[in-house]
């Protein structure tokens, strides 16, 4: 089974405000609200939405086998195999292809992690029309030790000290995945921002964005090894270069 393609960074003016904890600005406290779908359409499973009536990740701390899927076109999302769709997973997100990790399989169906609120939300999508690949890599973040480890075939390929969320704006724990690769349109604190499919649990919004958690660089090395962010994970320049080569959909496991 081939691996998913490495994402080419997309230049977006919104990159700097999409994610939480990425510099100056403020957030709005709370637990998020459901984004209404226009005209009664099903809500889209994106980083901007909150989805109702879908199951939570059954094993939020377990390792995944690296199987990831990409819908060739918008896929219906159900709470159970064969149940009516309650959301839709678009084929593209943030100007790039949607790749999501598989957490469970049944005949004709794949249960996948979704990039929406609440954190750890999952849904079942039909396996017809899916491109399937396998990522041999995984990313682990230990919030307590404030370290990030890149795994290749289950073995550490690099470990770095990182900055994580402050006590009042912690980095959320659980399983998620690499969602996108964004290059800010204007010079900012990081040449690359790598959003994941998780959000701040304490901020509804941050800097005009939906409070998406991301990996990104930082101009000062003094922050590494500290709990000082609004939820994002600030990484050293060498780590960011390595993470930039990781395919979209690659599992990310964040532990306390």
Model-derived regions, located:
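Bacterial N-terminal signal peptides that target proteins for export
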Residues: 1-10
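C-terminal motif of bacterial Sec signal peptides marking the signal peptidase cleavage site
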Residues: 18-21
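Bacterial signal peptide processing site
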Residues: 23-26
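Boundary regions of SH3-family modules and the immediately adjacent low-complexity/disordered segments
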Residues: 32-62, 114-141
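Beta-loop motif signature
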Residues: 39-101
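A mature extracytoplasmic/lumenal domain signature
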Residues: 81, 106, 114-118, 129, ...
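SH3/SH3-like beta-barrel superfamily modules
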Residues: 88-128
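Exported/periplasmic cell-wall-interacting domains
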Residues: 116, 129-138, 170-175, 185-256
């Amino acid at each position: 089974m081939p691996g998913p393609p490495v994402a080419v960074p997309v230049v977006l003016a919104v990159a700097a405000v999409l994610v939480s904890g990425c510099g100056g600005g403020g957030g709005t406290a709370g637990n998020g609200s459901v984004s209404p779908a226009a005209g009664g359409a099903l809500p889209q499973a994106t980083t901007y939405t909150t989805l109702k009536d879908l199951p939570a990740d059954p094993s939020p701390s377990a390792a995944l086998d690296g199987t990831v899927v990409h819908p060739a076109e918008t896929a219906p999302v159900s709470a159970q195999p064969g149940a009516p769709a309650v959301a839709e997973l678009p084929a593209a997100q943030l100007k790039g292809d949607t790749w999501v990790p598989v957490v469970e399989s049944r005949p004709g169906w794949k249960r996948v992690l979704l990039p929406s609120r609440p954190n750890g939300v999952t849904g079942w999508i039909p396996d017809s029309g899916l491109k399937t690949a396998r990522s041999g890599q995984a990313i682990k973040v230990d919030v307590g030790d404030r370290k990030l480890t890149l795994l290749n075939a289950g073995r550490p390929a690099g470990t770095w000290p990182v900055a994580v969320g402050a006590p009042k704006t912690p980095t959320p724990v659980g399983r998620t995945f690499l969602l996108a690769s964004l290059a800010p349109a204007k010079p900012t604190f990081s040449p690359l921002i790598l959003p994941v499919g998780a959000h701040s649990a304490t901020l509804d919004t941050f800097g005009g964005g939906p409070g998406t958690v991301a990996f990104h660089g930082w101009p000062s090395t003094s922050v590494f090894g500290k709990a000082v962010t609004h939820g994002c994970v600030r990484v050293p320049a060498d780590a960011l270069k390595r993470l930039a080569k990781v395919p979209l959909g690659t599992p990310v496991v964040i532990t306390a």
